[in-house]
Amino acid sequence: MKNIKFLFIAILALVASACVESEPDYKNFPSKDVDFTFAVEGNEYSTDFYYVSTLQFTNTSSKQGTVHWDFGDGSSSSEANPTHKYDKSGSYNVTLTIDGVGSRTYPILIMDIVPMLSVAEQSAEIVTIKDVSIKLGIELPNPDNLTCRYVWNMPEGTTLADGTPIETFEGYSHDDGTIDNPGELKFNNIGSQKIEVQTYFDINGENRRLADSYINVQVGANIEAPTLYYACYGGNIKAYKMIDESQLPEGTKNLPFDMGVSSGVTPQNIIFATVDDQDFIYILDCGKNFCYQVDNDGVLGDGKITVMSADGKYANLVISNVGGHAFSDPFSGCVIGDKLYYNDRNTGFSTISLTDRGKKETRVNSNTESYFCSNQSLGYYNRGIAYGAVHTALAYDKDGVFWWPKCYNASGIFRFKTEDIGKTEASPTEVLLSGSTCKAFALDEKRNHFYCWLTSGAAGVGFAQFPKVAYESTLSVTEHTKYFKMSAAATAGTTSSYEALYVTQFAVDDATGNVYFGFIADDGETHPTGIYYYDYAAGEIKHFGNSSDKALGICINPRKTKLF
Protein backbone atom coordinates (compact mmCIF):
# COMPACT_ATOMS: atom_id res chain seq x y z
CA MET A 1 0.00 0.00 0.00
CA LYS A 2 2.87 2.34 0.84
CA ASN A 3 4.42 1.59 -2.54
CA ILE A 4 1.19 2.53 -4.30
CA LYS A 5 0.95 5.86 -2.45
CA PHE A 6 4.55 6.66 -3.29
CA LEU A 7 3.98 5.91 -6.96
CA PHE A 8 0.87 8.13 -7.03
CA ILE A 9 2.74 11.02 -5.45
CA ALA A 10 5.63 10.58 -7.87
CA ILE A 11 3.30 10.75 -10.86
CA LEU A 12 1.67 13.93 -9.55
CA ALA A 13 5.07 15.49 -9.09
CA LEU A 14 6.09 14.60 -12.63
CA VAL A 15 2.90 16.05 -14.11
CA ALA A 16 3.23 19.23 -12.10
CA SER A 17 6.85 19.58 -13.12
CA ALA A 18 5.95 19.12 -16.80
CA CYS A 19 3.26 21.80 -16.57
CA VAL A 20 5.68 24.32 -15.11
CA GLU A 21 8.34 23.63 -17.75
CA SER A 22 5.94 24.11 -20.73
CA GLU A 23 4.20 27.22 -19.43
CA PRO A 24 4.49 29.92 -22.15
CA ASP A 25 5.81 33.42 -21.66
CA TYR A 26 2.69 35.59 -21.70
CA LYS A 27 4.44 38.95 -21.57
CA ASN A 28 4.83 39.37 -25.37
CA PHE A 29 1.52 37.95 -26.65
CA PRO A 30 -0.45 40.01 -29.20
CA SER A 31 -1.83 43.02 -27.39
CA LYS A 32 -4.34 45.74 -28.13
CA ASP A 33 -1.91 48.11 -26.43
CA VAL A 34 0.64 47.61 -29.22
CA ASP A 35 0.05 49.05 -32.68
CA PHE A 36 1.85 50.73 -35.57
CA THR A 37 1.32 52.23 -39.01
CA PHE A 38 3.45 52.23 -42.14
CA ALA A 39 3.56 54.39 -45.27
CA VAL A 40 5.79 55.21 -48.22
CA GLU A 41 8.07 58.19 -47.74
CA GLY A 42 7.25 61.00 -50.14
CA ASN A 43 4.11 61.71 -52.13
CA GLU A 44 4.64 60.39 -55.67
CA TYR A 45 4.11 56.69 -54.90
CA SER A 46 2.47 56.99 -51.49
CA THR A 47 -0.15 54.32 -52.17
CA ASP A 48 2.13 51.71 -53.75
CA PHE A 49 4.62 49.58 -51.84
CA TYR A 50 7.43 48.85 -54.31
CA TYR A 51 10.58 47.01 -53.37
CA VAL A 52 12.74 50.09 -53.93
CA SER A 53 10.47 52.33 -51.86
CA THR A 54 11.49 53.60 -48.42
CA LEU A 55 8.79 52.69 -45.89
CA GLN A 56 8.28 54.68 -42.71
CA PHE A 57 7.11 52.61 -39.72
CA THR A 58 5.51 54.54 -36.85
CA ASN A 59 4.90 53.18 -33.36
CA THR A 60 1.38 54.20 -32.25
CA SER A 61 1.20 51.96 -29.16
CA SER A 62 -0.66 53.18 -26.06
CA LYS A 63 1.98 51.73 -23.73
CA GLN A 64 5.70 52.33 -23.72
CA GLY A 65 8.72 50.08 -23.37
CA THR A 66 11.73 48.74 -25.22
CA VAL A 67 10.77 48.16 -28.86
CA HIS A 68 11.90 45.57 -31.35
CA TRP A 69 10.91 45.54 -35.03
CA ASP A 70 11.04 42.39 -37.18
CA PHE A 71 10.51 43.26 -40.87
CA GLY A 72 9.96 39.67 -41.97
CA ASP A 73 12.90 39.60 -44.38
CA GLY A 74 15.60 38.73 -41.85
CA SER A 75 16.29 42.33 -40.84
CA SER A 76 15.27 44.12 -37.64
CA SER A 77 15.51 47.43 -35.79
CA SER A 78 15.34 48.78 -32.24
CA GLU A 79 14.57 52.35 -33.31
CA ALA A 80 11.31 53.86 -32.16
CA ASN A 81 10.13 54.78 -35.68
CA PRO A 82 12.43 53.16 -38.24
CA THR A 83 12.52 53.24 -42.03
CA HIS A 84 13.12 50.17 -44.15
CA LYS A 85 13.57 49.10 -47.78
CA TYR A 86 12.82 45.63 -49.12
CA ASP A 87 15.21 44.11 -51.64
CA LYS A 88 12.65 41.81 -53.23
CA SER A 89 8.96 41.79 -53.97
CA GLY A 90 6.77 39.44 -51.93
CA SER A 91 4.56 39.16 -48.86
CA TYR A 92 6.14 39.93 -45.49
CA ASN A 93 4.90 39.86 -41.89
CA VAL A 94 6.10 42.89 -39.92
CA THR A 95 6.05 42.53 -36.11
CA LEU A 96 6.46 45.23 -33.47
CA THR A 97 7.21 43.91 -29.98
CA ILE A 98 7.27 46.00 -26.77
CA ASP A 99 8.92 44.15 -23.92
CA GLY A 100 6.52 43.40 -21.12
CA VAL A 101 3.50 44.66 -23.09
CA GLY A 102 3.01 42.43 -26.13
CA SER A 103 3.27 42.49 -29.91
CA ARG A 104 1.41 43.33 -33.09
CA THR A 105 1.89 41.80 -36.58
CA TYR A 106 0.67 43.14 -39.93
CA PRO A 107 1.20 41.62 -43.39
CA ILE A 108 2.63 43.85 -46.09
CA LEU A 109 2.72 43.16 -49.82
CA ILE A 110 5.78 44.53 -51.59
CA MET A 111 5.20 44.81 -55.31
CA ASP A 112 7.53 44.23 -58.21
CA ILE A 113 8.18 47.15 -60.53
CA VAL A 114 6.80 46.57 -64.01
CA PRO A 115 7.19 49.05 -66.87
CA MET A 116 3.89 50.06 -68.46
CA LEU A 117 3.81 50.52 -72.23
CA SER A 118 1.21 52.46 -74.17
CA VAL A 119 0.60 53.94 -77.60
CA ALA A 120 1.15 57.60 -76.86
CA GLU A 121 0.53 58.89 -80.38
CA GLN A 122 -0.61 57.59 -83.75
CA SER A 123 -0.94 59.43 -87.03
CA ALA A 124 -4.41 58.03 -87.85
CA GLU A 125 -7.32 56.49 -85.97
CA ILE A 126 -6.58 53.00 -87.33
CA VAL A 127 -3.01 51.76 -87.53
CA THR A 128 -2.49 50.17 -90.95
CA ILE A 129 0.55 48.76 -92.70
CA LYS A 130 3.16 51.02 -94.25
CA ASP A 131 1.52 54.43 -93.90
CA VAL A 132 0.36 54.96 -90.27
CA SER A 133 2.98 55.64 -87.62
CA ILE A 134 2.82 55.33 -83.84
CA LYS A 135 4.91 56.55 -80.93
CA LEU A 136 5.12 54.49 -77.77
CA GLY A 137 5.12 55.74 -74.21
CA ILE A 138 6.68 54.03 -71.21
CA GLU A 139 6.07 54.61 -67.51
CA LEU A 140 8.09 53.09 -64.69
CA PRO A 141 7.57 53.73 -60.97
CA ASN A 142 10.99 54.93 -59.84
CA PRO A 143 10.79 56.33 -56.29
CA ASP A 144 14.55 56.84 -55.93
CA ASN A 145 15.03 58.10 -59.50
CA LEU A 146 17.53 55.35 -60.21
CA THR A 147 19.10 55.03 -63.63
CA CYS A 148 17.27 52.54 -65.86
CA ARG A 149 18.36 50.91 -69.07
CA TYR A 150 15.70 49.87 -71.59
CA VAL A 151 16.12 47.37 -74.41
CA TRP A 152 13.27 47.47 -76.95
CA ASN A 153 12.77 44.41 -79.18
CA MET A 154 10.68 45.09 -82.30
CA PRO A 155 8.70 42.56 -84.33
CA GLU A 156 9.73 41.62 -87.84
CA GLY A 157 8.89 44.31 -90.38
CA THR A 158 9.11 47.30 -88.03
CA THR A 159 10.65 50.47 -89.45
CA LEU A 160 11.36 54.01 -88.39
CA ALA A 161 9.28 56.79 -89.94
CA ASP A 162 11.78 57.13 -92.80
CA GLY A 163 11.54 53.42 -93.65
CA THR A 164 14.76 52.33 -91.94
CA PRO A 165 14.32 48.82 -90.49
CA ILE A 166 14.68 48.58 -86.71
CA GLU A 167 15.03 45.39 -84.67
CA THR A 168 16.26 46.67 -81.29
CA PHE A 169 16.68 49.99 -79.54
CA GLU A 170 18.57 50.68 -76.31
CA GLY A 171 17.90 53.75 -74.21
CA TYR A 172 18.16 55.17 -70.69
CA SER A 173 16.14 57.17 -68.21
CA HIS A 174 17.45 60.59 -67.20
CA ASP A 175 17.41 62.79 -64.11
CA ASP A 176 14.91 65.17 -65.69
CA GLY A 177 12.36 62.33 -65.93
CA THR A 178 12.68 61.75 -69.67
CA ILE A 179 13.27 58.33 -71.20
CA ASP A 180 15.02 57.64 -74.50
CA ASN A 181 12.45 56.58 -77.09
CA PRO A 182 12.84 54.91 -80.49
CA GLY A 183 10.53 57.54 -82.00
CA GLU A 184 7.89 57.07 -84.68
CA LEU A 185 7.41 53.49 -85.83
CA LYS A 186 5.67 51.91 -88.81
CA PHE A 187 4.83 48.28 -89.55
CA ASN A 188 5.02 46.25 -92.74
CA ASN A 189 3.00 43.27 -91.48
CA ILE A 190 -0.69 42.83 -90.63
CA GLY A 191 -1.69 41.45 -87.22
CA SER A 192 -0.66 41.85 -83.59
CA GLN A 193 2.79 43.41 -83.58
CA LYS A 194 4.34 42.54 -80.23
CA ILE A 195 6.90 45.02 -78.93
CA GLU A 196 8.83 43.80 -75.89
CA VAL A 197 10.88 45.88 -73.46
CA GLN A 198 13.54 44.60 -71.08
CA THR A 199 14.25 46.95 -68.17
CA TYR A 200 17.34 46.97 -65.98
CA PHE A 201 17.45 48.82 -62.64
CA ASP A 202 20.68 50.14 -61.15
CA ILE A 203 20.38 49.31 -57.44
CA ASN A 204 23.61 49.81 -55.49
CA GLY A 205 25.60 49.03 -58.60
CA GLU A 206 23.59 45.89 -59.36
CA ASN A 207 22.28 45.60 -62.91
CA ARG A 208 18.94 44.05 -61.93
CA ARG A 209 16.49 42.99 -64.64
CA LEU A 210 12.88 43.80 -63.86
CA ALA A 211 9.85 41.98 -65.20
CA ASP A 212 9.63 42.26 -68.98
CA SER A 213 6.77 44.22 -70.52
CA TYR A 214 5.13 44.10 -73.90
CA ILE A 215 2.39 45.71 -75.92
CA ASN A 216 0.45 44.33 -78.88
CA VAL A 217 -0.12 46.95 -81.55
CA GLN A 218 -3.05 45.86 -83.73
CA VAL A 219 -2.05 46.69 -87.30
CA GLY A 220 -4.70 46.54 -89.99
CA ALA A 221 -4.56 45.92 -93.72
CA ASN A 222 -4.26 48.46 -96.50
CA ILE A 223 -7.61 47.31 -97.95
CA GLU A 224 -10.91 46.34 -96.37
CA ALA A 225 -11.64 42.63 -95.92
CA PRO A 226 -13.71 40.23 -93.77
CA THR A 227 -12.19 38.84 -90.56
CA LEU A 228 -11.71 35.19 -89.63
CA TYR A 229 -11.84 34.47 -85.89
CA TYR A 230 -10.76 31.25 -84.22
CA ALA A 231 -10.47 29.89 -80.68
CA CYS A 232 -6.99 28.68 -79.79
CA TYR A 233 -7.10 25.47 -77.77
CA GLY A 234 -5.45 26.50 -74.50
CA GLY A 235 -5.05 30.13 -75.55
CA ASN A 236 -6.88 33.26 -76.66
CA ILE A 237 -9.29 34.16 -79.42
CA LYS A 238 -7.27 35.08 -82.51
CA ALA A 239 -8.13 36.54 -85.90
CA TYR A 240 -6.87 36.88 -89.46
CA LYS A 241 -7.81 39.33 -92.18
CA MET A 242 -9.20 37.31 -95.11
CA ILE A 243 -7.07 38.92 -97.79
CA ASP A 244 -5.75 37.57 -101.03
CA GLU A 245 -2.00 37.82 -100.52
CA SER A 246 -1.57 38.96 -104.12
CA GLN A 247 -3.25 42.22 -103.07
CA LEU A 248 -0.67 42.94 -100.37
CA PRO A 249 2.46 45.05 -100.86
CA GLU A 250 5.60 43.11 -101.59
CA GLY A 251 7.13 41.65 -98.45
CA THR A 252 4.03 42.14 -96.29
CA LYS A 253 2.87 39.19 -94.20
CA ASN A 254 -0.69 38.51 -93.06
CA LEU A 255 -0.15 37.50 -89.42
CA PRO A 256 -2.77 36.69 -86.75
CA PHE A 257 -4.23 39.12 -84.24
CA ASP A 258 -4.23 38.11 -80.58
CA MET A 259 -7.54 39.52 -79.35
CA GLY A 260 -6.50 39.31 -75.69
CA VAL A 261 -9.67 37.40 -74.70
CA SER A 262 -9.42 33.84 -73.40
CA SER A 263 -10.89 31.04 -75.52
CA GLY A 264 -11.77 29.15 -72.33
CA VAL A 265 -10.97 25.49 -71.76
CA THR A 266 -12.67 23.64 -74.64
CA PRO A 267 -14.19 26.20 -77.05
CA GLN A 268 -15.81 23.82 -79.56
CA ASN A 269 -17.83 26.62 -81.21
CA ILE A 270 -17.57 30.37 -81.59
CA ILE A 271 -20.47 32.16 -83.26
CA PHE A 272 -20.64 35.55 -84.98
CA ALA A 273 -23.66 37.82 -84.56
CA THR A 274 -24.53 41.47 -85.12
CA VAL A 275 -26.63 43.15 -82.43
CA ASP A 276 -27.79 46.74 -82.98
CA ASP A 277 -25.15 47.17 -85.69
CA GLN A 278 -22.40 46.04 -83.30
CA ASP A 279 -20.43 42.88 -84.14
CA PHE A 280 -19.87 40.22 -81.48
CA ILE A 281 -18.28 36.79 -81.11
CA TYR A 282 -20.03 34.31 -78.77
CA ILE A 283 -17.65 31.74 -77.26
CA LEU A 284 -19.19 28.38 -76.33
CA ASP A 285 -16.83 26.72 -73.87
CA CYS A 286 -17.95 23.26 -72.69
CA GLY A 287 -15.20 23.19 -70.07
CA LYS A 288 -12.89 20.40 -69.02
CA ASN A 289 -15.62 17.85 -68.28
CA PHE A 290 -17.05 17.65 -71.80
CA CYS A 291 -17.23 13.86 -72.13
CA TYR A 292 -19.20 11.35 -70.09
CA GLN A 293 -19.07 12.09 -66.35
CA VAL A 294 -20.54 10.34 -63.32
CA ASP A 295 -22.20 13.43 -61.86
CA ASN A 296 -24.86 12.09 -59.52
CA ASP A 297 -24.88 15.32 -57.51
CA GLY A 298 -25.12 17.49 -60.63
CA VAL A 299 -22.23 19.78 -59.68
CA LEU A 300 -19.42 19.02 -62.16
CA GLY A 301 -20.48 21.53 -64.80
CA ASP A 302 -17.71 23.97 -65.72
CA GLY A 303 -18.83 25.41 -69.05
CA LYS A 304 -19.98 28.88 -69.99
CA ILE A 305 -20.82 31.21 -72.86
CA THR A 306 -18.94 34.49 -73.06
CA VAL A 307 -19.26 37.29 -75.58
CA MET A 308 -16.51 39.43 -77.07
CA SER A 309 -16.80 42.55 -79.18
CA ALA A 310 -15.28 42.19 -82.64
CA ASP A 311 -12.32 44.38 -81.67
CA GLY A 312 -11.66 42.47 -78.43
CA LYS A 313 -12.06 45.57 -76.26
CA TYR A 314 -15.18 44.22 -74.54
CA ALA A 315 -15.90 40.79 -73.06
CA ASN A 316 -18.65 39.62 -70.73
CA LEU A 317 -20.31 36.50 -69.38
CA VAL A 318 -23.54 35.50 -71.10
CA ILE A 319 -24.43 32.39 -69.10
CA SER A 320 -22.53 30.09 -66.74
CA ASN A 321 -23.00 26.42 -65.91
CA VAL A 322 -20.16 26.33 -63.39
CA GLY A 323 -21.36 24.18 -60.50
CA GLY A 324 -24.32 22.84 -62.51
CA HIS A 325 -24.71 19.44 -64.13
CA ALA A 326 -21.78 18.52 -66.37
CA PHE A 327 -24.04 17.45 -69.24
CA SER A 328 -25.65 20.92 -69.31
CA ASP A 329 -22.47 22.69 -70.46
CA PRO A 330 -22.73 24.58 -73.81
CA PHE A 331 -21.18 22.66 -76.72
CA SER A 332 -22.32 24.04 -80.08
CA GLY A 333 -25.03 26.19 -81.57
CA CYS A 334 -26.22 28.80 -84.05
CA VAL A 335 -27.88 32.21 -84.14
CA ILE A 336 -31.49 32.52 -85.28
CA GLY A 337 -32.89 36.04 -85.23
CA ASP A 338 -32.13 37.68 -81.89
CA LYS A 339 -31.42 34.43 -80.05
CA LEU A 340 -28.56 32.02 -79.61
CA TYR A 341 -29.62 28.37 -79.82
CA TYR A 342 -27.11 26.10 -78.07
CA ASN A 343 -26.69 22.37 -77.49
CA ASP A 344 -25.90 20.62 -74.26
CA ARG A 345 -24.05 17.30 -74.39
CA ASN A 346 -26.81 14.78 -75.02
CA THR A 347 -30.32 15.96 -74.10
CA GLY A 348 -31.28 18.91 -76.29
CA PHE A 349 -30.82 22.58 -77.07
CA SER A 350 -31.97 25.79 -75.41
CA THR A 351 -32.19 29.46 -76.34
CA ILE A 352 -30.91 32.67 -74.84
CA SER A 353 -31.21 36.27 -75.99
CA LEU A 354 -28.12 37.71 -77.68
CA THR A 355 -28.32 40.64 -75.26
CA ASP A 356 -28.48 38.58 -72.04
CA ARG A 357 -25.55 38.90 -69.67
CA GLY A 358 -24.58 37.29 -66.36
CA LYS A 359 -27.15 34.49 -66.47
CA LYS A 360 -26.99 31.17 -64.59
CA GLU A 361 -27.81 27.94 -66.44
CA THR A 362 -31.10 26.46 -65.21
CA ARG A 363 -31.74 23.63 -67.65
CA VAL A 364 -31.55 20.13 -66.19
CA ASN A 365 -30.90 17.15 -68.43
CA SER A 366 -33.39 15.05 -66.46
CA ASN A 367 -36.14 17.60 -67.20
CA THR A 368 -36.71 17.86 -70.95
CA GLU A 369 -39.28 20.63 -70.45
CA SER A 370 -36.41 23.00 -69.66
CA TYR A 371 -35.23 22.73 -73.31
CA PHE A 372 -36.45 24.31 -76.52
CA CYS A 373 -36.03 20.88 -78.10
CA SER A 374 -34.87 17.52 -76.71
CA ASN A 375 -34.13 14.12 -78.21
CA GLN A 376 -37.29 12.74 -76.62
CA SER A 377 -39.50 15.48 -78.07
CA LEU A 378 -38.94 14.40 -81.68
CA GLY A 379 -40.49 11.62 -83.72
CA TYR A 380 -36.96 10.32 -84.34
CA TYR A 381 -36.79 9.12 -80.74
CA ASN A 382 -36.57 5.31 -80.79
CA ARG A 383 -36.57 5.61 -84.60
CA GLY A 384 -32.90 6.50 -85.01
CA ILE A 385 -32.27 8.54 -81.87
CA ALA A 386 -31.80 6.59 -78.64
CA TYR A 387 -31.62 7.87 -75.09
CA GLY A 388 -28.58 10.09 -74.50
CA ALA A 389 -27.71 10.65 -78.16
CA VAL A 390 -24.75 13.06 -78.23
CA HIS A 391 -25.01 16.20 -80.39
CA THR A 392 -22.13 17.56 -82.47
CA ALA A 393 -23.55 20.67 -84.17
CA LEU A 394 -26.70 22.68 -84.84
CA ALA A 395 -27.73 24.62 -87.95
CA TYR A 396 -30.87 26.28 -89.30
CA ASP A 397 -31.63 26.90 -92.98
CA LYS A 398 -33.65 29.52 -94.86
CA ASP A 399 -36.61 27.11 -95.12
CA GLY A 400 -36.92 26.91 -91.34
CA VAL A 401 -35.32 23.47 -91.03
CA PHE A 402 -33.04 22.51 -88.14
CA TRP A 403 -30.07 20.28 -88.98
CA TRP A 404 -28.94 18.29 -85.92
CA PRO A 405 -25.96 15.90 -86.37
CA LYS A 406 -25.43 13.15 -83.77
CA CYS A 407 -22.44 10.98 -82.93
CA TYR A 408 -23.51 8.46 -80.25
CA ASN A 409 -26.74 6.49 -79.72
CA ALA A 410 -27.69 8.00 -83.05
CA SER A 411 -25.76 8.43 -86.27
CA GLY A 412 -26.33 10.85 -89.09
CA ILE A 413 -28.04 14.21 -89.47
CA PHE A 414 -31.60 14.68 -88.22
CA ARG A 415 -33.75 17.40 -89.80
CA PHE A 416 -36.97 18.86 -88.47
CA LYS A 417 -39.00 22.05 -88.21
CA THR A 418 -40.22 23.88 -85.12
CA GLU A 419 -43.72 22.49 -85.61
CA ASP A 420 -42.30 18.95 -85.44
CA ILE A 421 -41.15 19.42 -81.85
CA GLY A 422 -43.50 17.53 -79.54
CA LYS A 423 -44.87 15.29 -82.29
CA THR A 424 -43.50 11.86 -81.46
CA GLU A 425 -45.72 9.54 -83.49
CA ALA A 426 -43.45 9.50 -86.59
CA SER A 427 -40.09 10.75 -87.87
CA PRO A 428 -40.32 14.22 -89.48
CA THR A 429 -38.33 13.08 -92.53
CA GLU A 430 -35.47 10.83 -93.63
CA VAL A 431 -32.11 10.75 -91.82
CA LEU A 432 -29.12 11.99 -93.80
CA LEU A 433 -25.80 10.11 -93.80
CA SER A 434 -27.22 7.33 -91.63
CA GLY A 435 -24.53 5.17 -90.06
CA SER A 436 -21.88 7.91 -90.12
CA THR A 437 -20.55 10.31 -87.53
CA CYS A 438 -20.44 13.97 -88.54
CA LYS A 439 -18.48 16.22 -86.17
CA ALA A 440 -18.07 19.71 -87.67
CA PHE A 441 -20.99 20.73 -89.92
CA ALA A 442 -21.93 23.71 -92.09
CA LEU A 443 -24.49 24.69 -94.72
CA ASP A 444 -23.80 26.68 -97.88
CA GLU A 445 -27.28 27.42 -99.18
CA LYS A 446 -26.01 29.86 -101.79
CA ARG A 447 -24.26 27.00 -103.60
CA ASN A 448 -26.56 24.25 -102.37
CA HIS A 449 -24.01 22.21 -100.42
CA PHE A 450 -23.39 21.05 -96.89
CA TYR A 451 -20.10 19.99 -95.32
CA CYS A 452 -19.17 17.40 -92.70
CA TRP A 453 -16.07 16.37 -90.85
CA LEU A 454 -16.48 12.60 -90.87
CA THR A 455 -15.00 10.60 -88.01
CA SER A 456 -16.54 7.23 -88.89
CA GLY A 457 -18.62 5.54 -91.57
CA ALA A 458 -18.20 3.98 -94.99
CA ALA A 459 -16.82 7.16 -96.60
CA GLY A 460 -13.74 7.31 -94.39
CA VAL A 461 -12.34 10.02 -92.14
CA GLY A 462 -11.88 13.65 -93.14
CA PHE A 463 -13.51 16.57 -94.97
CA ALA A 464 -16.55 15.87 -97.15
CA GLN A 465 -18.90 17.94 -99.32
CA PHE A 466 -22.47 16.80 -100.04
CA PRO A 467 -25.32 18.20 -102.13
CA LYS A 468 -28.09 19.84 -100.12
CA VAL A 469 -31.02 17.61 -101.00
CA ALA A 470 -34.72 18.33 -100.62
CA TYR A 471 -36.29 18.00 -97.18
CA GLU A 472 -38.12 14.83 -98.16
CA SER A 473 -35.03 13.19 -99.67
CA THR A 474 -32.21 11.21 -98.11
CA LEU A 475 -28.52 10.77 -98.84
CA SER A 476 -25.93 8.15 -97.96
CA VAL A 477 -22.47 8.97 -96.66
CA THR A 478 -20.86 7.61 -99.84
CA GLU A 479 -22.73 10.13 -102.03
CA HIS A 480 -20.30 12.96 -101.34
CA THR A 481 -19.24 15.29 -104.15
CA LYS A 482 -15.84 16.03 -102.62
CA TYR A 483 -13.81 14.10 -100.08
CA PHE A 484 -10.35 14.68 -98.60
CA LYS A 485 -8.82 12.24 -96.19
CA MET A 486 -7.26 14.04 -93.24
CA SER A 487 -6.55 12.58 -89.82
CA ALA A 488 -7.28 15.03 -87.00
CA ALA A 489 -6.14 14.36 -83.45
CA ALA A 490 -8.73 13.19 -80.95
CA THR A 491 -7.19 15.67 -78.49
CA ALA A 492 -7.03 15.14 -74.73
CA GLY A 493 -10.14 14.94 -72.59
CA THR A 494 -11.85 11.68 -73.47
CA THR A 495 -11.13 8.06 -74.23
CA SER A 496 -14.27 7.79 -76.37
CA SER A 497 -13.81 8.17 -80.12
CA TYR A 498 -17.41 9.40 -80.34
CA GLU A 499 -16.76 12.38 -78.08
CA ALA A 500 -13.21 13.19 -79.16
CA LEU A 501 -12.72 16.69 -80.54
CA TYR A 502 -11.17 16.17 -84.00
CA VAL A 503 -12.50 19.16 -86.00
CA THR A 504 -15.32 20.91 -84.15
CA GLN A 505 -16.58 23.67 -86.47
CA PHE A 506 -16.64 24.95 -90.05
CA ALA A 507 -17.05 28.55 -91.22
CA VAL A 508 -18.36 29.21 -94.74
CA ASP A 509 -17.39 32.42 -96.52
CA ASP A 510 -20.60 33.42 -98.26
CA ALA A 511 -18.73 35.52 -100.83
CA THR A 512 -16.38 32.80 -102.10
CA GLY A 513 -17.83 29.51 -100.87
CA ASN A 514 -14.56 28.71 -99.12
CA VAL A 515 -14.91 26.61 -95.96
CA TYR A 516 -12.51 27.31 -93.07
CA PHE A 517 -11.63 25.05 -90.14
CA GLY A 518 -9.04 24.52 -87.43
CA PHE A 519 -7.01 21.33 -87.77
CA ILE A 520 -4.96 19.64 -85.04
CA ALA A 521 -2.91 16.99 -86.80
CA ASP A 522 -2.89 13.40 -85.60
CA ASP A 523 0.37 11.48 -85.32
CA GLY A 524 1.71 10.66 -88.77
CA GLU A 525 -0.61 13.11 -90.57
CA THR A 526 1.06 14.90 -93.49
CA HIS A 527 -1.00 18.08 -93.07
CA PRO A 528 0.55 20.11 -90.22
CA THR A 529 -1.56 21.71 -87.49
CA GLY A 530 -3.08 25.07 -88.40
CA ILE A 531 -6.00 26.81 -90.11
CA TYR A 532 -7.18 25.25 -93.39
CA TYR A 533 -9.82 26.03 -95.94
CA TYR A 534 -11.55 24.28 -98.77
CA ASP A 535 -10.97 26.45 -101.82
CA TYR A 536 -14.36 26.17 -103.50
CA ALA A 537 -13.24 27.48 -106.89
CA ALA A 538 -10.17 25.25 -107.05
CA GLY A 539 -11.79 22.26 -105.37
CA GLU A 540 -8.77 21.83 -103.08
CA ILE A 541 -7.88 21.88 -99.38
CA LYS A 542 -5.33 24.61 -98.67
CA HIS A 543 -3.32 25.75 -95.67
CA PHE A 544 -4.24 29.31 -94.66
CA GLY A 545 -0.99 31.28 -94.76
CA ASN A 546 1.58 29.97 -92.32
CA SER A 547 -0.89 29.36 -89.49
CA SER A 548 0.17 26.81 -86.89
CA ASP A 549 -2.21 27.40 -83.98
CA LYS A 550 -4.32 24.61 -82.47
CA ALA A 551 -7.82 25.90 -83.17
CA LEU A 552 -11.29 24.55 -82.35
CA GLY A 553 -14.17 27.00 -82.83
CA ILE A 554 -14.06 29.24 -85.91
CA CYS A 555 -16.31 31.91 -87.47
CA ILE A 556 -16.31 34.76 -89.98
CA ASN A 557 -17.26 38.40 -89.58
CA PRO A 558 -18.33 39.29 -93.15
CA ARG A 559 -18.16 43.03 -92.52
CA LYS A 560 -15.26 44.39 -94.58
CA THR A 561 -12.87 46.50 -92.54
CA LYS A 562 -9.18 47.33 -92.48
CA LEU A 563 -8.96 46.25 -88.85
CA PHE A 564 -12.06 44.85 -87.08
Predicted segments, located by residue:
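Short coil/turn segments that connect the beta-strands within blades of beta-propeller domains
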Residues: 225-226, 278-279, 337-338, 399-400, ...
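Residue position within the beta-strands of beta-propeller blades
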Residues: 230, 282-284, 342, 404-405, ...
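Surface loop/turn motifs at the tips and blade-to-blade linkers of beta-strand repeat domains
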Residues: 255-266, 318-326, 367-387, 430-436, ...
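Repeated scaffold domains used in trafficking and secretory/extracellular systems
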Residues: 265-278, 325-337, 380-395, 435-446, ...
